[in-house]
């Protein structure tokens, strides 16, 4: 079987067991290809994380492909139908950890850039790659650090295409033009431990906190807008008690998360939570962690370029969406860049037997190349 350029490079990347935060030479494989077509290669290592900044051209505007080489752990190997790091094609599907999220998109980006540069050696502006091995992990030494470095030297990205698997039913049907913000909290409610037979000598933090938690669950934080659904509050963990059946616990710990829209700020959410907890007279402490601000790329040059390319290649009228979890786009958007996420189908990401349709790889490459044509030719 003759493999296309994109499929061949995908197979090479998928053979690398790059479980986060280990890159396992994926970035070197990409950098070697890019260097041959005139990209300046700049590895950036922070802590135990490999990052790659590659750029062809010195002028603006700057079109940047962004993505990650790290993958999530495989889970039980005996549950896979084949070795997750020995990619296999079966029934038109390419199986392997990272096939959907997101090594095939990385391959498509490289091949699209090679083809575009061959046709337009003196293209407008610059093409860049921002690749990290710390997207699936804590995301502390990855894209955010590269962006900080670029900002310090006033190197700006105009348009950024993140290759996350955005498609739902067919290639290109969904493009993510924004993401909700994510705000986490750990709430500790203090009570007084005691014997269940003598409740008057104790204070049960579960009983005291329950009305407040119920109110938090029932609160309408906002109504969303045309791009974002309403803000969602979800409790993920509750822990209290010693395990004994005759002891009133002395403390309660609750972990919760907000996925929030551009209609509200993290500070407003924090303030409203404190007001509810205070109203119920709780003795508490709370630790907040903001893991991502919401961002939105309105219809403009990048959205138009992507929608046109998808329509030309696949015949699909794409839909803009802000659904799903956070991505590294949250670190790039605050610089003022227009950010879009466009990649293969996301139905099997992070799952056992993760796979992608082989027949989507060349059209994805064509879409990426056409976006470059639309913006930099």
From Swiss-Prot:
Keywords: Amino-acid biosynthesis, Cobalt, Diaminopimelate biosynthesis, Hydrolase, Lysine biosynthesis, Metal-binding, Zinc. The active site is at residues 70, 135. Its EC number is 3.5.1.18. Zn(2+) 2 binds at residues 101, 136, 350. Binds 2 Zn(2+) or Co(2+) ions per subunit. Pathway: Amino-acid biosynthesis; L-lysine biosynthesis via DAP pathway; LL-2,6-diaminopimelate from (S)-tetrahydrodipicolinate (succinylase route): step 3/3. GO terms for molecular function: acetylornithine deacetylase activity; cobalt ion binding; succinyl-diaminopimelate desuccinylase activity; zinc ion binding. Signal peptide: none annotated. Pfam families: M20_dimer, Peptidase_M20. It catalyses: N-succinyl-(2S,6S)-2,6-diaminopimelate + H2O = (2S,6S)-2,6-diaminopimelate + succinate. It is an enzyme of class 3 (hydrolase). Zn(2+) 1 binds at residues 68, 101, 164. It comes from the Bacteria. One of its GO terms (biological process) is lysine biosynthetic process via diaminopimelate. Its cofactor is Zn(2+); Co(2+). Catalyzes the hydrolysis of N-succinyl-L,L-diaminopimelic acid (SDAP), forming succinate and LL-2,6-diaminopimelate (DAP), an intermediate involved in the bacterial biosynthesis of lysine and meso-diaminopimelic acid, an essential component of bacterial cell walls. NCBIfam families: dapE_proteo, PRK13009.1. Homodimer. Belongs to the peptidase M20A family. DapE subfamily. This is Succinyl-diaminopimelate desuccinylase. It comes from Acinetobacter baumannii (strain AYE). The gene is dapE.
């Amino acid at each position: 079987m003759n493999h296309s350029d994109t499929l061949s490079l995908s197979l090479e990347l998928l053979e690398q067991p790059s479980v986060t935060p280990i890159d396992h030479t994926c970035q070197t494989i990409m950098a070697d290809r890019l260097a041959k077509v005139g990209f300046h290669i700049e590895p950036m290592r922070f802590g135990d994380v490999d990052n790659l900044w590659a750029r062809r051209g010195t002028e603006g505007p700057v079109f940047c492909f962004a993505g990650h080489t790290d993958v999530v752990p495989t889970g039980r190997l005996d549950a896979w139908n084949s070795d997750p790091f020995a990619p296999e094609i079966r029934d038109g599907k390419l199986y392997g950890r990272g096939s959907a999220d997101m090594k095939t998109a990385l391959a498509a980006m490289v091949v699209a850039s090679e083809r575009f540069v061959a046709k337009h050696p003196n293209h407008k502006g610059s093409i860049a790659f921002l690749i990290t091995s710390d997207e699936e992990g804590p995301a502390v030494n990855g894209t955010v650090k590269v962006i900080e470095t670029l900002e310090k030297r006033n190197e700006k990205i105009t348009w950024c295409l993140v290759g996350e698997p955005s498609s739902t039913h067919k290639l290109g049907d969904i493009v993510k033009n924004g993401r909700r913000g994510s705000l986490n909290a750990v709430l500790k409610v203090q009570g007084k431990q005691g014997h269940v037979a003598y409740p008057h000598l104790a204070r049960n933090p579960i009983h005291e906190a329950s009305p407040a938690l119920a109110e938090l669950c029932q609160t309408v934080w906002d109504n969303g807008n045309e791009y974002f659904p309403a803000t969602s509050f979800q409790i993920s963990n509750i822990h209290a008690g010693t395990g004994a059946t005759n002891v009133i616990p002395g403390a309660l710990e609750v972990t919760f998360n907000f996925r929030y829209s551009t209609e509200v700020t993290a500070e407003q959410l924090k303030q409203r939570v404190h007001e509810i907890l205070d109203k119920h007279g709780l003795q508490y402490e709370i630790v907040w962690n903001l893991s991502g601000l919401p961002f939105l790329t309105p219809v403009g040059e990048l959205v138009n370029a992507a929608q046109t390319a998808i329509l030309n290649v696949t015949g699909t009228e794409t839909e803009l969406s802000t659904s799903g979890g956070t991505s590294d786009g949250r670190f790039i958007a605050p610089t003022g860049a227009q950010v879009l996420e466009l990649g293969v189908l996301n139905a099997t990401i992070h799952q056992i037997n993760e796979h992608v349709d082989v027949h989507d790889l060349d059209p994805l490459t064509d879409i990426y190349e056409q976006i470059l044509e639309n913006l930099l030719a």
